[in-house]
Amino acid sequence: MGYNQQLLRVDYEKIYPINDELSSKILGVIKNLNGKSDILVISDYAKGLITKELMDDIKKEFKGKILIDPKPKNDFYKDVYLIKPNLKEASQILGREIENKDDELEKSGLESVDKYNSNFVITRGEKGATLITVDEIFTMFQQKSKRS
């Protein structure tokens, strides 16, 4: 500590896939959501909870729309309703840098839609977010707050 401020932090963690028992419990909860919820949102932190096998089972069992906030190193989100990466994650998903320009984002977004058979919302920092579907591209701009 220096002048009551943290100067350095070191974390250690072990990341490993979940076991079959926990996977079954998660699927049981998701099955119970059918008829109660039309949308399932999954935020993946790449800590081992969401495995390819679990994701495949979730897609089979859940009858509503699945929305994913992904980690690019996990490449098993095909055929969900919507994937919401930020610009950096979208670049990692495609394996190349995507510039934060409308035409570049539209081209890359359509490529992502085709590759994953899913809609995409790519968040773009101060440039808002862009929704890309098979049929349309829509950019939403962030409203700047006014100070009184």
Swiss-Prot record:
InterPro entries in the record: PfkB_dom, Ribokinase-like
Signal peptide (from-to): none
Pfam families named in the record: PfkB (PF00294)
Protein name: Uncharacterized protein MJ1336
